[in-house]
Amino acid sequence: MTSKLEQLKQFTTVVADTGDLDAITRLKPVDATTNPSLLLKAAAIPGYADLLKQVKADAKGDVDLACDKFAVAVGSGILKVIPGRISTEVDARLSFDEPALLNKARQLIALYEAAGVPKDRVLIKLASTWEGIRAAEKLEKEGIQTNLTLLFSFAQAQACADAGVFLISPFVGRIYDWYKKSTGKDYVGAEDPGVQSVTRIYNYYKANGYNTVVMGASFRNIGQIEQLAGCDRLTISPELLQQLSDDQGELPQVLKPGNAGEAKQPLNESQFRWAMNEDAMGTEKLAEGIRQFARDQEKLEKLMAEKA
C-alpha cells in the first residue's frame, strides 16, 4: 500500500506551506506557499543566516526593501527544488489600499525577474478584501497571477471567481477554530465547518465553470485533508505532510468536479460588504488574519533593522 501522501498526489496538487527548504526537499511538493509568519520562522533557521546578511547588505538600510528581498530570496531558493510555483505575500498592512497593493505586487515581480525567476513561476498573495480582489483583477490582466488568501466566507470566494483570479486559498483550520470556540463543540469529518466551506466553494466553482484554482489551506489535522481529497490543490504544513507520508491507510477521492453546486451569483461592492457583515466568522477571521500577518511583518522589519 502506498502512503496517504502519494495517494493524495494522484488527484490533488500538493503544496508545502513553509519556507523550510530542507522540509520541501524531503517532502517533494509541486508548489510552495509563504507568508510573513512563515518568513519570520525561516529567518530563525540557521541555514538562512548568510542570506539574511546578504539581503541586508544589498538593501543598504532600506528595511522595507530588505524584507521584500528576503521574501524573494527565500522564494527563489525554494523554486530550485520544486517544479511549480512559489506564492509570496504582499504586506498585509496594505490590504485596504488598492494602488499600494498594485505597486508592491509589481515590485515583488520585478525583484523575482531581477533574480532570474520568470513571473509565471510566482503567485502574488493578497488578502481577500474588496480592495485586494480588485487589485488582483488588474494584476491578472497584466499577466501577474495571484493567490487570494485569508478567505473565510462564501462571498469572498464569489467575488474572487468573478474577478478571474488565478487561485484562492480558503482556510479550513481557522474556520474550525472559530466554530469550536463559539459553540464548544468538536467537529470531525464532513461535519467540520472548515471542510464544509471549502467543499461548498469547490462545488460552486466547478458547477459554474470558473477556472480559478481552489487551494484549501490552514489545516489542523489530516482528517480535514482527507475530507478534501480531490480539491484542485491543498497547501499543507511539513508536519502534516509527514503524517500523511507515514500513514499507509487508504485515502479515497472525496471532491469531484461532477458534484452539484449553487447557481452563479455575482456580487457588487455593496452586496459583498453586506454579505461579509452578515458573516461574523468571516469578518472576524479576516480582520484577525490581517492583524497577525501585519504584526509578523513588523517583527520581520525589526529583525532586518537590528541586523543591518
From Swiss-Prot:
Signal peptide boundaries: none
GO annotation terms (biological process): carbohydrate metabolic process; pentose-phosphate shunt
Annotated CDD domains: Transaldolase_TalAB
Catalytic residues identified in the record: 125 (schiff-base intermediate with substrate)
CC annotations in GO: cytosol
Domain of life: Bacteria
Keywords: Cytoplasm, Pentose shunt, Schiff base, Transferase
Assembly and oligomerization: Homodimer.
Role this protein plays: Transaldolase is important for the balance of metabolites in the pentose-phosphate pathway.
Name of the protein in question: Transaldolase
Organism this protein belongs to: Pseudomonas putida (strain GB-1)
Gene, per the UniProt record: tal
